[in-house]
Amino acid sequence: MLDCLVGSEMCIRDRGGNTSDMINIWKRHNLIKVFKDAYEKGIILSGISAGAVCWFDWILSDSVNKELSPLKGINFLDGSCTPHSSDNNRLRQFISEIKDGNLPDGIAIDDGVAVLFIDGVPSEVYSSRINHDAYYVTKHDKISLKTYIKKLNG
């Protein structure tokens, strides 16, 4: 039944919540496979907050013990991600976790910002707020994701 419902949709949107609980519920009910099949059929997967970052290999999340720490994602998108990076403490910790080798290179997304991925690659950044952006973070650098996308496109 769920396969039929998801198969008829053009977009799946996750509104967020507790990232760890959400991923565990998805695993328990085999929804990760359903979402993967939908993704492979071209259905758009989207979300905000926890719902935006769950698709990555790794997440910086406060959903376990209310403290920011690395959390395994569902591996649809390479690297790591954190939402709410307009909170400077979260952004600093994300950068620190990457520099320390606890997270792979990744994307930090400010509140009010959306990132469009096509075939697993970031291709557009949209912001509804002035001075809010998304960033590509490595062990050595933090740059605007828009700049990183321009470099990818040569």
What are these regions (language model features)?
Residues M1-G7, C11:
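Single conserved hydrophobic/aromatic residue that forms the stacking wall/gate
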Residues G17, A50-G51, V113, G120:
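Alpha-helix/helix-capping structural signal
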